[in-house]
Amino acid sequence: MSIPVIFIHKGDHFYLNYSLNQIKITNPETPVYLITDSITHKHSHVTYVDINRYFTEAKEFAKIYKHMSTNGFDNELFCFQRWYILKEFCEDKKLDNVLYLDSDLLLYCNIEQTFHQYDHFDFTISKKLSPHCCYFPSISKLKKFCDFIPKLYLDPNYIDRFLTKHQYHLTNNLNGGVCDMTAFNEYQKEQDVKALDLSLITNNEIFDDNINDADGFEMKDGIKSLLFDKGYYYGTNKETGQRIKFNTLHFQGPAKKNIADYYLGSDFKKIKRKLHFECFLNNNLFLFKVARRLGYKFY
C-alpha cells in the first residue's frame, strides 16, 4: 500500500489548500487524509475525517498536561494531542507507515521513492525538534512515542527541569517553553531511539526546516533565495557554492503569505484571484456575511 499522507488541522485556512493540492500534483496516487473540525469536501482527492472521532486519548492526555509555555494554552495542548489523534486514526484504519505533514508545507518529492529509504528509523525530524514533515515507518513506532510523552508531566526529573526552563523564559521575556518539540527532542535521548534529521544535506538534497531562516543558504527579501528547475526548487549553499535540491518548503509563521508563489498547480492564478477576493470580503464584515448567506465557499 502507498504511504498515506495525513494532515491534522483545525479550521479551514487558505494555506492548507495549497498544501493539499500540492500532494495531488506531485504524488497523484497517494492517499491523502485531512483530520479536521471543518469538513468541507472541497478537494475530491482528500478523505475528510471528523477529528472528534479520534479524540479519546487526546482528552485523556489533557488531564495530565501542565502548561509551561508563553504560547497559548489551547495551541500547545493541541500540538501534543495531534499525535494521539494520529495514532488512534492509524489504528482504526489499520495503517502502518504514515507521513504526517504540517498544513503550511509544500512537498515536491516522490513519497514512495523518498521515504521508504527511512524505514529503519523510528521517525523523521528537522533540527532534532520540528516534526512538520514526520514519517513514521510503523504504527508501533508512533505508539512508542505517544507512550513516552506522559513522562514529561509525570516523571519528577522532567517536571523540575521543565519548570525551571519555563521560569527562565518568563524571567527573561523569551517566547516558548515546553511543547511537543521538547518531547521529540527528549525522546531522541532514549536508548534505541533512532531519528533521521531531514534538515541535513544528503546527496545534494534537503528538506526545508523554515523558509524564513537561511540555514546556510543565500537569502532574498527575508526568505531563502530559490530557483525553480524541472519541478523542484534549488538553493545555493553559501559555504560550498553548490546547488541543493529542496524536497519540501516550510512556510512557517509570516511566510505563509508566500506559499502561493511556490505552489506548482496550473490553477494557481484562479486560486490566487479567489484568495484576493476573500481578503477583500474579510475586510468588509457586511459583504462577508452576505457571501456566507448566499452559500459562497471560502478557501
What are these regions (language model features)?
Residues 146-284:
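Catalytic core and acceptor-binding pocket of nucleotide-sugar-dependent glycosyltransferases
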Residues 25-29, 88-99, 139-143, 190:
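Secondary-structure boundary elements
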Residues 1-68, 91, 266-299:
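N-terminal anchoring/stem segment of glycosyltransferases
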Residues 34, 118-122, 153:
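Catalytic phosphate/metal-binding cores of nucleic-acid and nucleotide-processing enzymes, i.e., regions
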Residues 122-140:
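Short beta-strand-to-loop element that shapes/binds the nucleotide-sugar donor at the catalytic cleft/hinge
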Residues 60-73, 157-163:
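An acidic/histidine-cluster motif and surrounding catalytic segment
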Residues 78-124:
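GT-A fold catalytic core of metal-dependent nucleotide-sugar glycosyltransferases
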Residues 11-13, 39-40, 54, 105-107, ...:
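Short, solvent-exposed loop/turn segments at secondary-structure junctions
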